[in-house]
């Protein structure tokens, strides 16, 4: 008897295992958002803790966490650092796994005050949830004597709060600026002034005085960076507006034009004269006087340094990152000061001879500044036009460098010229595709022709108008990485398109996640994206054919053959 019971249990377990093995590949194995990201909160007077218990195999996006107080004032919310996650479409993003605890300080809360918390996450298997919004009721809190601050949740690290290059590049830019025609010839004179006209100083003493001079100059630049970044932080949201980004791009372009010699950009001569007189009153050779000289020198901008400095300051203001602002300007000043330190210690023999090459260095920095408007405009015009702008900039730079290199007489420059010409030819490809319509033609040939719907009523109407044909409904959103993978890799496949030739194709773009989108998702009982639904000729969905998560073209084609009604 016991043996029969054991055999029966084993048979039942085996049946469930095989059912799992041969289960429908499109059936959802994902849990609801509240289970994937279990949210909770706890308030103790001024202290509020928000917690997320994140299920294994799931993660939250740091940049998608938003906190909005209602009838309450809260201190700045500092999100902890996450771990880096990278995908093909969105690049690097910071995410949270396992557990997230976010402390929030309530400075003041009236009766009935609330906190709206918005967050969004995905599964590692390629399934993303719509943004979730939770309302946290707040207990009444009396304001203390400290000044309350408005909420300030960090927005996005990689594209908004960082330069399009490492801050260490500021050091190299500073060194490069030192070799422009307005700066390099002045170094021997500055060296003599710093040393106080004394010719018999020890090497250590000369190096110390020059270092102090550079630190004075760096202090001025660092202070400028901190002030500008702090000002930008107060207007962070406004500085991300498309019109502001376009305005900044125009300013950066004008700054680049000044580096090309179209006009001269510098401080008014009267102000420069006052600053120079203040510097001349300081005593060279003494640490205090040398430090003040350096600090004042940081304010005296020559035509060659004004445009790069203005470009860096404007971009720092746009980023709103104070650490980035101060550090970048400090490295920039240090880069400008390194050649001065070498000249002071080793003499003028280290200086290269002046010549037309210094103007070429200045022009090259004009192209560097032109990269900034392209970087900003990408956020407004999109990736395709952004790629075309990068292409135009690359062609212009490599073309200029190739023409400039033709003046060289050395034999090895022929190799450089070939490399520059090849780089220009590679850079022109996106413009070539645009001009001759290659990209547009490819997109027209490969993309499925979806009919867009928005509401439940529009879906029902489309099912009626299908007139007995099977219907496929694709739920899409810009924030869904796997949805973009479906577009690029699966829906573009000829076999998939052939299998869907007699199917009515509908698509609902729920990127906005507004009331209509949420109503549609709720009506269809959809947890997240990507989700693809199949309806028969009578307008009835076949739940077993539903697809959740990404499928490549081969798997999706097999699914269409086996499961499509």
Swiss-Prot record:
Its main localization is: membrane
Q: How does it sit in the membrane?
A: Multi-pass membrane protein
The family database entries (NCBIfam families) matched by this protein are listed as: PRK00293.1
A biological process (GO) of this protein is:
cell redox homeostasis
For this protein, the record's SUPFAM superfamilies field holds: Thiol:disulfide interchange protein DsbD, N-terminal domain (DsbD-alpha) (SSF74863), Thioredoxin-like (SSF52833)
**Which species is this record about?**
Escherichia coli O6:H1 (strain CFT073 / ATCC 700928 / UPEC)
Matching InterPro entries, A to Z?
Cyt_c_assmbl_TM_dom, DsbD_gamma, DsbDN, DsbDN_sf, Thiol_diS_interchange_DbsD, Thioredoxin-like_fold, Thioredoxin-like_sf, Thioredoxin_CS
Q: Which cysteines are joined by disulfide bonds?
A: 122-128, 182-304, 480-483
What this protein catalyses is:
[protein]-dithiol + NAD(+) = [protein]-disulfide + NADH + H(+); [protein]-dithiol + NADP(+) = [protein]-disulfide + NADPH + H(+)
In short, the EC number is: 1.8.1.8
Give the GO cellular component terms, alphabetically: plasma membrane
Domain of life, per UniProt, equals Bacteria
Give the Gene Ontology MF terms in alphabetical order: electron transfer activity; protein-disulfide reductase [NAD(P)H] activity
Annotated compartments: Cell inner membrane
Q: Which residues form the signal peptide?
A: 1-19
The record's similarity note reads: Belongs to the thioredoxin family. DsbD subfamily.
Which chain regions cross the lipid bilayer?
Answer: 163-183, 208-228, 243-263, 289-309, 323-343, 357-377, 384-404
- Residues in Thioredoxin domain copies: 434-565
Q: Which UniProt keywords apply?
A: Cell inner membrane, Cell membrane, Cytochrome c-type biogenesis, Disulfide bond, Electron transport, Membrane, NAD, Oxidoreductase, Redox-active center, Signal, Transmembrane, Transmembrane helix, Transport
Spell out the protein name for this chain.
Thiol:disulfide interchange protein DsbD
UniProt function note:
Required to facilitate the formation of correct disulfide bonds in some periplasmic proteins and for the assembly of the periplasmic c-type cytochromes. Acts by transferring electrons from cytoplasmic thioredoxin to the periplasm. This transfer involves a cascade of disulfide bond formation and reduction steps.
Q: Name one Pfam family in it.
A: DsbD_TM
